[in-house]
Structure formats: structure tokens, C-alpha cells
């Protein structure tokens, strides 16, 4: 008998998708899911997924519940090769998490994040009786000229000035899903900056945490220590996505998963938390410097940051440094209205993130975001 899954999850090997899949394990609800995994055969895909889930704290005895038939081999660049798989005809819910999340100019950003998602959505909408299509975007798709705090559902349209090619692609696919598939039961989740895990630290992924390590190592960054940054842990993000996926009726079709003004930490608070892990005192000689001023330190990058590509470090400082000065917060009242709890501030678990990063160089940790 052909396996008849109810939920398709793409991006389960990614940071957010892996956390959501771990949440399904915790709830005992993984048996009805099928996972799109980039692999040439199911056995290879299963091994990749198992390794990801181990990093999210799933035990071996739980992982034995996964079956080969739950692996759909393929990716968003070759939708035509798997969209007619007979197992997909029973799909009711889709979690669209797969994306090229590189903050460089990766050539696959647009083909994957826009064309691939659209091809998948068209194919599934044609074949399946979908109840929910949960697309994971980014709160940064709001653009540079957003009000602060950024309202949920905010859209400046074609006037949007995008931060990066990645954020532009995530904005574009949202608009085209609405335009091209008006009957799609689309729910958009826009997480803010996702860093670490409240119980596992950076074991699942060191994405973005290296930015804080870099600023502390340089003792300089474009932001002031009293400026706040909107960050959520990946396990909170997974809890929110689970709610948006499973709640029978939702009040809205677009949500931020964010700390908001109330639960955003400032850089001094984050520094104090990290200092507990390093055993060093919090910074007393930090200097707020412009990107250009920090570039004058480039001959010290190797000494302060370890073996690194100075060009990529400079690019990272420009991207994250510019954003850090904006002090953007993303309103999260819609999610709270739906019954979601308040998030844990980064300053409450940054110590654990540092403890689980101490054996990884900053330049190595950067590879999570600069592929």
C-alpha cells in the first residue's frame, strides 16, 4: 500500500525546518509527514535527516521511527522530477521552509527561493486538496524604510528597498504566491533573526551567533552597546510554526515570529551573558565604530578572529553592522493573540550559545551564513 502522508515539509535539514521536525517528534506526530530532502536515494536522505535531528536533541530510539518511505528525494530546483510522486496526492498541509539562506550573492537564491517555491506551490495546488500552505519567510523582507516597530503584514510594495538578495527573494515569492494562486490557503510566517536554542545553544546551528562573537573580539561594531536587536531562539520559532500549522482556524494570514520591543535584548546584556561563559569580564573598552573605521583594523582580523577571509569578514561587518544600528523591532501581537507564549530574550541563553561555540572558530561558524 502506498504511503499516504498528510504533511509535506521542505527544508527539514535546515535550521528552522529541523527544529520544527524535532517538535513533531516531541509531539509524536512525525509518522504522517514526508520530507523533501536533497539526495540521490532515500537511504542517503534518511541519513542526512537523522544527523540533523540528532543535533536538535532527538534520541536514537526516537529516530528509529523514521521510515524510508518518508523521504522524498529532490530539491526546489528540480520540482518537475518529484511533483508527480504518488505519495503527494494525499497531502493536506505544506511547510515551505527550504531556501538558500546565504547572505552572500549565491547564484541559487532566486531559482530556489522564488522559482522553486512557485513551481512546487502550483504543482501541489493542482494535485492536492490543501488545507494550509505555511510559507516561512523573513521579517527582514520589510525593507530598509520600514516603520519601527514593524507592523505585521507591512508591505511597501515596489518601493521596498531590500537589505539583501536573500530578503528580496523572500519578499518576491510571497507576493507572487498571492497573485498567482489566490485560492492557496497561504499563511506566511516571518521570523526575525533566529539565533541558537534555549536548551541546546548553538549545537543545531551557529547561524548569526558568530556576529556577536565577532563584535566582542573586535571590541568594536557600528552599533552602541545600549541598542537592542530583535532575536528569537529556534525552538521558540518551531513552537510558533507548529501552532500556525496545526491550529484549525487562524485570525490572520501573516505573522511575525519575533521578540518585539519588549523581549529584544541590547548588546550590553548579550555581552554580559556571553562573559559568563568565557569567564572574562564584560567589555569596558568597546568602541562604536563605523564600517570604514573597522576596515582600518583589517590587518588584525586574523589575530582577533582566527584564520579568515578578510573580504568576507568585511562584507559581514557591513551587512550586520548596518542592520545593528537600525534597532528594528518586529511587532508580534498577532502571534500572541493566537495563544503563543512570549519569547525568551537572547540575553537569557547567549551564555549557552557561547559554551557550545567555544571549540568552533568564528570564521568556521560564519560558514552557516556565507556558503
Which functions belong to the PLM regions below?
Residues 27, 34, 318-321, 325-371:
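Amphipathic terminal alpha-helices
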Residues 95-96, 104-106, 115-165:
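Conserved Rossmann-fold NAD(P)-dependent oxidoreductase catalytic core, especially the SDR/UDP-sugar
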Residues 105, 209-236, 240-244, 258:
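A conserved pocket-lining segment of Rossmann-fold NAD(P)-dependent short-chain dehydrogenase/reductase
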Residues 148, 160-190:
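Active-site Tyr-X1-5-Lys
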Residues 7-27:
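N-terminal Rossmann NAD(P)H-binding glycine-rich loop of SDR-like oxidoreductase domains
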Residues 30, 197-208, 244-255:
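Glycine/proline-rich active-site loop of Rossmann-fold NAD(P)-dependent oxidoreductases
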Residues 244-318, 360-370:
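Mid/C-terminal beta-alpha module of Rossmann-like enzyme folds, strongest
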Residues 63-115, 125-127:
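NAD(P)H-binding glycine-rich loop region in Rossmannoid oxidoreductase-like domains
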Amino acid at each position: 500500500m502506498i504511503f499516504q502522508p498528510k504533511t509535506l515539509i521542505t527544508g527539514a535539514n535546515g535550521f528552522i525546518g529541523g527544529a520544527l521536525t524535532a517538535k513533531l517528534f516531541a509531539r509524536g506526530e512525525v509518522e504522517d509527514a514526508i520530507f523533501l530532502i536533497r539526495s540521490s536515494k532515500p537511504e542517503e536522505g534518511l541519513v542526512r535527516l537523522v544527523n540533523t535531528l540528532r543535533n536538535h536533541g532527538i534520541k536514537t530510539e526516537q529516530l528509529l521511527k523514521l521510515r524510508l518511505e518518508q523521504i522524498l528525494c529532490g530539491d526546489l530546483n528540480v520540482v518537475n522530477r518529484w511533483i508527480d510522486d504518488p505519495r503527494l496526492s494525499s497531502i493536506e498541509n505544506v511547510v515551505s521552509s527550504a531556501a538558500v539562506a546565504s547572505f552572500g550573492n549565491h547564484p541559487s537564491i532566486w531559482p530556489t527561493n522564488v522559482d522553486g517555491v512557485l513551481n512546487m506551490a502550483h504543482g501541489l495546488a493542482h494535485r492536492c486538496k490543501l488545507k494550509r500552505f505555511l510559507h516561512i519567510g523573513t521579517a527582514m523582507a520589510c525593507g530598509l524604510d520600514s516603520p519601527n516597530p514593524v507592523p505585521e503584514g507591512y508591505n511597501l510594495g515596489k518601493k521596498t528597498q531590500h537589505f539583501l538578495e536573500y530578503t528580496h527573494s523572500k519578499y518576491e515569492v510571497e507576493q507572487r504566491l498571492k497573485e498567482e494562486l489566490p485560492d492557496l490557503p497561504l499563511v506566511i510566517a516571518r521570523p526575525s533573526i533566529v539565533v541558537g536554542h534555549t536548551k541546546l545553544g548553538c549545537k543545531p546551528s551557529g547561524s548569526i551567533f558568530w556576529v556577536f562573537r565577532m563584535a566582542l573580539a573586535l571590541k568594536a561594531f557600528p552599533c552602541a552597546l545600549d541598542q537592542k536587536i530583535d532575536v528569537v531562539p529556534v525552538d521558540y520559532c518551531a513552537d510558533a510554526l507548529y501552532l500556525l500549522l496545526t491550529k484549525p482556524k487562524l485570525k490572520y494570514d501573516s505573522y511575525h515570529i519575533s521578540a518585539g520591543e519588549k523581549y529584544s535584548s541590547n548588546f550590553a546584556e548579550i555581552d554580559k551573558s556571553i562573559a559568563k561563559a568565557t569567564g572574562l569580564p564584560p567589555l569596558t573598552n568597546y568602541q562604536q565604530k563605523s564600517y570604514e573605521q573597522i576596515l582600518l583594523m583589517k590587518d588584525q582580523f586574523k589575530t582577533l578572529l582566527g584564520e579568515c577571509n578578510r573580504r568576507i569578514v568585511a562584507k559581514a561587518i557591513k551587512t550586520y553592522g548596518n542592520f545593528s544600528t537600525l534597532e528594528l523591532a518586529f511587532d508580534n501581537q498577532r502571534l500572541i493573540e493566537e495563544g503563543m507564549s512570549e519569547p525568551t530574550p537572547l540575553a537569557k541563553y547567549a551564555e549557552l550559545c557561547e559554551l557550545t561555540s567555544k571549540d568552533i572558530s568564528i570564521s568556521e561558524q560564519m560558514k552557516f551564513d556565507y556558503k
